[in-house]
């Protein structure tokens, strides 16, 4: 039964062909037939080797149409900054007490923000938050004194990205229920951010391949030039 369903979903998708972005979005949306609102993910293969420090790609992008998911935000802060975080809508706010909770294995948040003075304390959580990609980092705006702005950005569609070992960077950029225009705008915003994050050590062709897929659907390869007009080399 599952095999038949998979074959039917895959019908019409040529794994050797590159599709225009708008066509690819339509194909992915048509095949997102699960009983839940599937996440649409974009994947980019980059011409970098992240084992070298000068070829690391990472950053954050605010998607114009949000991600469609509820993001739970934790903030490490004290005093007025803790109050600011709560007023901005942070789900969890604390200092030493929150560190103890996280060390105990209770992680009820998706994104973590800290004020700079809290980092010596938060640094103890590296082994817990690091592997989950949740360690606060000034490069992506999660170590900041503007906690209200960071909380609102996180809840409003901010997406962090970081290249993996094979030179791949990917992210969920929306839901199957989004209209095609919203998905296109989000994909272009993500691709633009990745291109702007091109490291000094990257040589030759930077964006090699781009593909999109839904949670349960097949990957659809896209013509790189149809995703962004920015140079890919």
From Swiss-Prot:
Give GO terms for biological process.
Answer: regulation of translation; translation
Q: InterPro entries under this entry?
A: Ribosom_uL1_bac-type, Ribosomal_uL1, Ribosomal_uL1-like, Ribosomal_uL1/biogenesis, Ribosomal_uL1_3-a/b-sand, Ribosomal_uL1_CS
Gene3D superfamilies in alphabetical order: 3.30.190.20, 3.40.50.790
Show the GO MF annotations. rRNA binding; structural constituent of ribosome; tRNA binding
One Gene Ontology cellular component = cytosolic large ribosomal subunit
One Pfam short name: Ribosomal_L1
Q: Which UniProt keywords apply?
A: Repressor, Ribonucleoprotein, Ribosomal protein, RNA-binding, rRNA-binding, Translation regulation, tRNA-binding
| Keyword Phosphoprotein listed | no
* Protein family per UniProt: Belongs to the universal ribosomal protein uL1 family.
Summarize the protein's role.
Binds directly to 23S rRNA. The L1 stalk is quite mobile in the ribosome, and is involved in E site tRNA release. Protein L1 is also a translational repressor protein, it controls the translation of the L11 operon by binding to its mRNA.
PANTHER family to which the protein is assigned, alphabetical: 54S RIBOSOMAL PROTEIN L1, MITOCHONDRIAL, LARGE RIBOSOMAL SUBUNIT PROTEIN UL1M
- Assembly description: Part of the 50S ribosomal subunit.
Which HAMAP family does the UniProt entry name for this protein?
Answer: Ribosomal_uL1_B
Record's protein name: Large ribosomal subunit protein uL1
- UniProt lists the gene as rplA
């Amino acid at each position: 039964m599952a095999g038949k369903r998979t074959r039917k979903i895959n019908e019409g998708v040529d794994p050797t062909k590159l599709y225009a972005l708008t066509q690819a979005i339509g194909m992915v949306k048509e095949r997102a037939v699960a009983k839940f609102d599937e996440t649409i993910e974009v994947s980019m293969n980059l011409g970098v080797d992240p084992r070298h420090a000068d070829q690391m790609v990472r950053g954050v992008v605010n998607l114009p149409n949000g991600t469609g998911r509820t993001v739970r935000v934790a903030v490490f802060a004290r005093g007025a900054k803790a109050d600011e975080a709560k007023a901005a809508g942070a789900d969890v706010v604390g200092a030493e007490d929150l560190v103890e909770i996280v060390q105990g294995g209770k992680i009820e948040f998706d994104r973590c923000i800290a004020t700079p003075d809290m980092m010596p304390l938060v640094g103890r959580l590296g082994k817990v938050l690091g592997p989950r990609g949740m360690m606060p980092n000034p490069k992506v705006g999660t170590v900041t004194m503007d906690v209200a702005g960071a909380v609102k950005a996180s809840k409003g569609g901010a997406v962090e990205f970081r290249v993996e070992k094979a030179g791949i960077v990917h992210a969920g950029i929306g839901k199957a229920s989004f209209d095609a225009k919203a998905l296109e705008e989000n994909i272009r915003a993500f691709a633009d951010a990745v291109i702007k994050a091109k490291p000094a050590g990257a040589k030759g062709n930077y964006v090699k391949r781009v593909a999109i897929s839904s949670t349960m659907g097949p990957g659809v390869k896209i013509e790189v030039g149809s995703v962004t007009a920015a140079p890919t080399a």
